[in-house]
């Protein structure tokens, strides 16, 4: 189950969203919104109010003469209840 959540996103926008109890993660492309909700509720023992997702565009990658693409991934913005937090972000204030 932890393999489905790749890593938390740490950008200026994601830190602004934490104040609104919205956390941003990169997740597996094959996950649907109900599956993402179940993964986070089981993994972090929280109540998920909403899940917003979008697919980020692929980027070109060149190695010598070969041209390929970086793997595509999905970004999920998770909205949780006001009195709950996700433990990964608890030490981000220091």
Swiss-Prot record:
<dbReference type="GO" id="GO:0003735">
    <property type="term" value="F:structural constituent of ribosome"/>
</dbReference>
<dbReference type="GO" id="GO:0019843">
    <property type="term" value="F:rRNA binding"/>
</dbReference>
<dbReference type="InterPro" id="IPR013025">
    <property type="entry name" value="Ribosomal_uL23-like"/>
</dbReference>
<keyword id="KW-0699">rRNA-binding</keyword>
<comment type="function">
    <text>Binds to 23S rRNA.</text>
</comment>
<keyword id="KW-0150">Chloroplast</keyword>
<dbReference type="InterPro" id="IPR012678">
    <property type="entry name" value="Ribosomal_uL23/eL15/eS24_sf"/>
</dbReference>
<dbReference type="GO" id="GO:0005840">
    <property type="term" value="C:ribosome"/>
</dbReference>
<dbReference type="GO" id="GO:0006412">
    <property type="term" value="P:translation"/>
</dbReference>
<keyword id="KW-0687">Ribonucleoprotein</keyword>
<keyword id="KW-0934">Plastid</keyword>
<keyword id="KW-0694">RNA-binding</keyword>
<dbReference type="InterPro" id="IPR012677">
    <property type="entry name" value="Nucleotide-bd_a/b_plait_sf"/>
</dbReference>
<dbReference type="Pfam" id="PF00276">
    <property type="entry name" value="Ribosomal_L23"/>
</dbReference>
<protein>
    <recommendedName>
        <fullName>Large ribosomal subunit protein uL23c</fullName>
    </recommendedName>
</protein>
<comment type="similarity">
    <text>Belongs to the universal ribosomal protein uL23 family.</text>
</comment>
<dbReference type="GO" id="GO:0009507">
    <property type="term" value="C:chloroplast"/>
</dbReference>
<comment type="subunit">
    <text>Part of the 50S ribosomal subunit.</text>
</comment>
<keyword id="KW-0689">Ribosomal protein</keyword>
<dbReference type="GO" id="GO:1990904">
    <property type="term" value="C:ribonucleoprotein complex"/>
</dbReference>
């Amino acid at each position: 189950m932890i393999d489905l959540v790749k890593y938390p996103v740490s950008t200026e926008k994601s830190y602004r969203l934490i104040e609104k109890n919205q956390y941003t993660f990169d997740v597996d492309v094959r996950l649907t919104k109900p599956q993402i909700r179940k993964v986070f509720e089981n993994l972090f023992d929280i109540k998920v109010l909403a899940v917003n997702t979008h697919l980020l565009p692929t980027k070109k990658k060149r190695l010598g003469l070969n041209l390929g693409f970086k793997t595509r991934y999905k970004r999920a913005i998770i909205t949780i209840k006001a009195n709950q937090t996700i433990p990964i972000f608890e030490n981000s204030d220091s």
